[in-house]
């Protein structure tokens, strides 16, 4: 009964409501900001390497790595392969579309997070959708609802799913026992995650800023090797992606399993553009202008979908291995690499899944620290945070042994609720984003390092950081 209800909500959200909202808002911000994905790409790359104002402050690069740690996860492997298995090859195209359009929404939401952020007693900055919902719309109630939805999504839904996806990569090993092994792997992952979480936000930032660049670069290099070894298949694969993407039978027939719906679902799960998660990391960065971090988070969407998700799709499709009922998700990716790289392939995917899942868990819990600080109106005391982190680690343990389809559906619904709150809000505040972008570009044209003050854009609401 519960699964039927969740599935019905999912189908409604992703076959009607969210498709219109996500694509519509992406087009709106892309046009209103005059295609920043192309026009300001160079500025985004420059902003990543800027040093923070203080030695203990979070840099743009570290904020990028935390948000990318959450974006770049098991969804880049399992999500992509599942989308292709269910929606067909054309779903890859729709993942690209939602990433390109969504990157403009990511620019908007992260710029707003910077504008309305607050500085805590510990010297760190806190912000995100909850902060700009209350400051600009004067609705703390809606802000708290968003926080609760996001905590449920990330600390439980996404983390449980990441744990399941990780243990599933071991299913082909001789020692794997379906009744025992998932719980053992879940227990080990929960213990390691708990150790990092109990070290607090600084430990999370340090771990993710080390692991994310390393694993991303290695993953892309291996995918390029696989494509080069199967280069003869590439033209037909690309042709098939575009052909199925615009095949109206594939797009609309049985919409729950269509190319468009699966591409948007899994693309959104992977890159998180517009749902209000990354702004929590973006707000923590110490920068001289809010738009700088907006551009950095736009870049994070590109890294996640246009690089890493595409890498998975191409590795699988050029290999010639056809997915089947018993060969979906991570096992399909492992089989594809095994055909090209031999026994090294499955082990590489296993290692990649361990790193992807681990950094996802840490990035997700970093977000929850920010949300709990907002709900409590101050940093929660140590006992509360210790208890929350233990419960979060327990969710990681439980997720390893749960049923995959139910976990996907629950995560999709929770993610959809976040998008339904955040996207209308950033649309209402779009003029603030446009004014900040105009101020940034005006200073760039004068060959200045952009510095922001709220009076520069005649901001009516008082800001805590930029006055």
Features from the language model and the residues they span:
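N-terminal alpha-helical transmembrane segments of multi-pass membrane transport
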Residues: 1-74, 84-91, 102, 427-467
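Membrane-interface loop-to-helix entry segments
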Residues: 21-28, 32-45, 165-170, 181-229, ...
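Helix-loop-helix module between adjacent transmembrane segments
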Residues: 25-30, 98-123, 129-130, 134-164, ...
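Extracellular/periplasmic helix-exit of transmembrane alpha-helices
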Residues: 30, 108-117, 222-240, 254, ...
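Transmembrane helix-loop junctions in multi-pass membrane proteins
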Residues: 2, 18, 32-37, 75-80, ...
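Flexible loop linkers connecting adjacent transmembrane helices
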Residues: 35-60, 82, 88-92, 104-137, ...
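Membrane-interface alpha-helices at helix entry/exit sites of multi-pass transporters
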Residues: 54-60, 89-97, 131-135, 139-147, ...
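Alpha-helical membrane segments and immediately flanking helix-loop junctions
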Residues: 54-86, 112-130, 134, 151, ...
């Amino acid at each position: 009964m519960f699964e039927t209800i969740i599935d019905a909500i999912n189908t409604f959200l992703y076959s009607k409501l969210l498709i219109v909202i996500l694509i519509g808002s992406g087009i709106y911000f892309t046009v209103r900001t005059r295609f920043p994905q192309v026009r300001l790409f160079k500025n985004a790359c420059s902003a990543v390497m800027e040093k923070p104002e203080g030695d203990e402050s979070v840099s743009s690069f570290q904020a990028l790595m935390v948000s990318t740690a959450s974006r770049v996860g098991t969804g880049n492997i399992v999500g992509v392969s599942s989308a292709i298995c269910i929606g067909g090859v054309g779903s890859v195209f729709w993942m690209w579309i939602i990433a390109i359009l969504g990157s403009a929404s990511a620019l908007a939401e992260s710029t707003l997070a910077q504008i309305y952020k607050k500085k805590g007693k510990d010297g760190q900055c806190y912000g995100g959708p909850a902060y700009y919902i209350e400051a600009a719309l004067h609705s703390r109630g809606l802000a708290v609802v968003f926080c609760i939805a996001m905590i449920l999504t990330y600390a439980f839904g996404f983390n449980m799913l990441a744990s399941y996806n990780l243990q599933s990569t071991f299913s082909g090993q001789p020692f794997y026992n379906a009744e025992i092994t998932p719980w053992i792997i879940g227990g080990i992952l929960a213990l390691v995650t708990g150790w990092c979480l109990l070290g607090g936000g600084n430990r999370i930032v340090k771990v993710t800023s080390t692991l994310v660049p390393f694993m991303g670069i290695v993953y892309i290099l291996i995918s390029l090797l696989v494509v080069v070894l199967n280069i003869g298949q590439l033209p037909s694969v690309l042709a098939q992606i575009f052909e199925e993407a615009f095949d109206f039978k594939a797009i609309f027939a049985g919409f729950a399993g269509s190319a468009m719906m699966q591409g948007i679902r899994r693309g959104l799960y992977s890159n998180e553009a517009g749902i209000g998660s990354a702004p929590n990391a973006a707000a923590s960065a110490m920068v001289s202008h809010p738009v700088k971090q907006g551009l950095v988070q736009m870049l994070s969407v590109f890294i996640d979908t246009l690089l890493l998700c595409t890498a998975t799709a191409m590795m699988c499709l050029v290999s010639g291995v056809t997915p089947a009922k018993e060969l979906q998700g991570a096992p399909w990716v492992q089989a594809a690499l095994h055909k090209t790289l031999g026994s090294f392939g499955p082990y590489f995917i296993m290692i990649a899944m361990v790193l992807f899942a681990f950094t996802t868990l840490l990035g997700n819990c970093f977000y929850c620290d920010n949300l709990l600080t907002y709900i409590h109106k101050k940093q929660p005391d140590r006992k509360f945070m210790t208890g929350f982190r233990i419960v979060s680690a327990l969710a990681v343990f439980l997720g390893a042994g749960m049923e995959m389809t139910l976990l996907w559906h629950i995560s999709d619904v929770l993610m959809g609720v976040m998008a339904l709150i955040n996207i209308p809000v950033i649309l209402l505040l779009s003029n603030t984003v446009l004014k900040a972008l105009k101020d940034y570009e005006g200073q760039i044209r004068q060959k200045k390092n952009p510095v922001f003050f709220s009076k520069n854009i005649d901001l009516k609401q008082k800001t805590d950081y930029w006055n």
